[in-house]
Amino acid sequence: QAALAGLPRGVVTGGAPGRGVILDGATTTACQIVLRADFPVSASERDGARALRLEPLPTRLTWEDVPEGTWAVGGDAAAPVTLPAHTSVLVAGPPGSGRSTALRALAQAMASDPLVVDDLDLADIATATQVEAALARSEVVLASASTEKVATTFRGAISTMREREALVVLWPGMRPADQAAGISLRTVTDPRAMTLPGRGALVYRGTCLPIQIVLPRPEDNDRPIEHPV
């Protein structure tokens, strides 16, 4: 790709977020863009530079396998994923991808008491209005909807969450995931796990991270969750 762009040899800077090249017509300078403090990264990537080692994402992960407060693992190190405090999350995915399980995992990981709405795309007017009001007050909202609905809704609570908050796209290799995310998800899609329940991508402020949702702990009198729903 660098050669196709006309870049000379020796200026390839790697694929880390923010890496780039400054071209002024005479010289070529490798550079690193200063990233925002709330740029989403996995825990190990946040700890500092180290030798690159790509860890495969697990195909199944329970709350007993991860540190307290972990709702997903992701990134090159398959490490616990974090988001800035007070961030709302919209979970998009087709039936069977694990939307409801993702909401439950997110809710258990939150320090606050968020408003949780499963199937926001099927909610009545009163519920949708409640979500919009909560977002306007900067309260944390966790909601889910079908990928198709997220991709084709341009106003209301779903549109607001897609544009302003974090988006979890389950089964990112399935149509119309790219349209729902507003960016191509090809680089975070594992062709061997296209329909693995709980497999997805975290999209936040123009960046994306491959993730696997953690199966949350059972609530009182609940059976353990064996598979994402």
Give names to the regions the model predicted.
Residues D124-R137, R155-I158:
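Conserved Walker B catalytic segment
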Residues P95:
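The conserved Walker
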